[in-house]
């Protein structure tokens, strides 16, 4: 790893990741550029590693000439990555890329939750293995991983679970595996990203009135799409040939969350818009 001469910029949002991530990288022979790595407990920005909170690290990566940007959340279980161009790698693709590396060395199955990208399934099948989807939640993912002897799994929000070490989301594991993958491929991060299927996930919600029975709405949507592949272990997920939509009710308010994935943003949003319209029709809104 040291001979690669990697430079990695780290945004640890001034939490514990600011201690452990730089140490890991330095021991791997990587030069570290630190951004918000003082564990003061006072988060320097919104700690959720989503695009709107990552503009600064993207700028630092580009201006410092770093090969990679690493962002972790306060408890270091979610990992987001930035390409050398300053563009986001995509939180869904953290797990996809790490799984690609693990499967190239260790044949086995993979698991992610129902709301995670289809890209993991594609990469798993490329290696001749089987992908399975669990209900949302780390405990559900790990339970299914154990049941199917999965060698890698996680959630599309940047959570990597590598059973060879332990059954829990771990950004440290993600960083080590991703950098090893990158070094063995001998390419830039932006080039690696282009190797994976391109999908876009749109996240929406529809607010209903308290008198509406959300469970009944989900049953009707399931019946409406009975000719498609429908999964109902966690809300209702409808798999179409080239896209999918996942409907989940909130446990605290009359809301249905709508996750849709397609080949690009426009198509994913169009699918979500169509589903919202159908739900409104069912509810007579």
Language-model segments: which ranges?
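Phosphate-binding chemistry for phosphorylated carbohydrates and sugar-nucleotides
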Residues: 1-185, 192
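Phosphate-binding and adjacent anionic-ligand microenvironments
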Residues: 68, 106-285
